[in-house]
Amino acid sequence: MKKKLYLPAAAFLAMTACTNDLDVEPLDPTVSTANRVYADAANYQKALDKIYSVWALSGQDGAGGSDISDLDAGNTVLFRSWFTLQTQTTDEMKNSWSDPWCLDVNGITWGTTKNAPVEGVYQRCMFIVASVTEYLKTIPNAPEEVDKTRFAAEARFCRALAYYTLLDMFGIPPFITEENYSINPSQLPREELFAWIESELQSIKEVLPAARQGEYGRADQAVVDALLARMYLNAEVYTGTDRYTDCIAACNRVIAGGYSLA
C-alpha cells in the first residue's frame, strides 16, 4: 500500500517543480513582457492610450491588422459596430452593402451565425475589460512619477463605458474585475451590473478633471455625468425603476460644464 502512495506523491512534486520552472522571463530580449514594458514609466501612459484607442481603432497595424484575429479590421471597429447596431436597426439609416451581416442588420434578422458588428461590439468591449483589468493589477507598482490615481480612474471609466455598452446591447455579459479575475467569470443580473457601473462612475468622478479642464479627448467629470445620464434615461429597462429625475440632473451638470446635448 505504501508503494502505491509513493508514486502519486512523487508525481505531484515533479509537477510542482515544473510549474515553478515555467514561472520565468523569456531569455529573448525582443519578447515583450509586462515586466519589461512597465520598466519604463512612460509606458503607463502609452498603455492607457491603447485602452482609449480600442473605441476607434481595430488594431495597431493599420487597415490590415486587428487586435482580435478573427474580426475584420474594417467592419468591426468598435464605434462603427456600435453605431451600426444602434442606428441601422431603426428607420434612421439603412446600408445597401451586400455583405450578409449588413442585410441581416437591415432586417433585424441575425441569428446564431457570425455577424460582424455584433461580434465587434461584444469582443472589443470584452477586450477593453480584460485590458483594463490587467492595467489596474499593474499600476499600483508604477514609479512615483506616474499619476497612478488619475490613470487608474481613466482606465476604470473606459471599463465602465464598455460594461454599459455590454449591459445595453447584451444584458448580462461576463463580469471581470481585478478583484475577481477568472477564466470562468460569473455574470451579474442586469440590475446588479447597472448598480456596479453607477457606483464605479461615482467613485472615480472626483478624481478626474473638472469639465474642459483636462487634456482633450480624455475622460473628465462631464463625460462621467454624460454616461450616467444615458444609464438613467433607460434605467427602467435595465432595473425596473425609472430614474428620469436623476437623468435630468446629470444632463444639467453636463450643460453647466460647457457642453451641449446632441
Question: What residue spans do the PLM features occupy?
Answer:
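Sec-exported extracytoplasmic/periplasmic mature domains
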Residues: 53-57, 134-141, 168, 202-210, ...
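Short, surface-exposed recognition loops and adjoining beta-strand edges that mediate ligand/DNA contacts
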Residues: 61-87, 208-226, 236-262
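Bacterial Sec-dependent N-terminal signal peptides
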Residues: 1-27
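Short acidic-aromatic linear motifs embedded in glycine-rich loops, typified by GG[WY][YF]DAGD(H)
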Residues: 19-154, 158-169, 174-192, 261-262
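Structural signature of alpha-solenoid helical repeat junctions
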Residues: 144-151, 158, 193, 213, ...
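Amphipathic alpha-helical repeat scaffolds of TPR domains
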Residues: 229-231
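Short, charged, amphipathic alpha-helices and their helix-cap/turn boundaries
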Residues: 191-206
